[in-house]
A protein has these predicted regions:
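A short alpha-helical cap/connector motif
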Residues: 1-167
Length: 167
């Protein structure tokens, strides 16, 4: 998926020129190349800025070294990047799905961007860390996002369970 986005940004079909399919043209021009901010972006970014120090404190005070090593790198990355998260927001806003499944949870900001466009859509996120779920849930509450459900435990078994209930 990431390579497709890189290709679109670097290809000669920039801004939709040369794309023959109307649906792909609309996707490129209205979603991928769109650079206008949505009102929800500022809400999520405000929560992000308020939680940077709080998150660092949780990682510093946590006794579990394996959790710290596992989450420190992705969390540091999530604190400062938002371009792909805003693309996720635009994709959800464009396609308007009823249910979204996210596998893996770092800080929950990408989950907020998935849940923000449509408060009626259910976003289910699978994570193996109750600590990150607790942290993310507090961020969701401060952002006013209530359409997120968590499945905590072994990611593979949680995924299998969710797929059985969805079908």
């Amino acid at each position: 998926y990431l390579e497709l986005v890189k290709y679109i940004f670097q290809s000669k079909y920039r801004k939709g020129f040369g794309v023959h399919s109307p649906s792909v043209f609309r996707l490129v021009t209205l979603v991928i190349e769109e650079d206008l901010p949505y009102y929800k972006f500022s809400l999520v970014e405000k929560v992000r800025s308020l939680t940077k120090n709080k998150l660092r404190g949780i990682l510093r005070d946590n006794e579990d070294e394996s959790l710290r090593q596992l989450t420190q790198s992705p969390i540091q990355k999530c604190l400062y990047t938002y371009d792909y998260e805003q693309l996720l927001f635009r994709l959800v806003n464009y396609y308007k799905p009823d249910a979204i499944l996210e596998i893996g949870l770092a800080t929950g900001f990408s989950t907020m961007y998935l849940a923000a466009p449509n408060s009626k859509a259910t976003v289910t996120t699978i994570s193996d860390s109750a600590l990150l779920e607790e942290f993310s849930n507090s961020n969701f509450k401060s952002a006013g996002i209530e359409n997120v459900e968590f499945a905590i435990g072994d990611i593979y078994s949680q995924f299998c369970t969710l797929m059985k209930t969805m079908s």
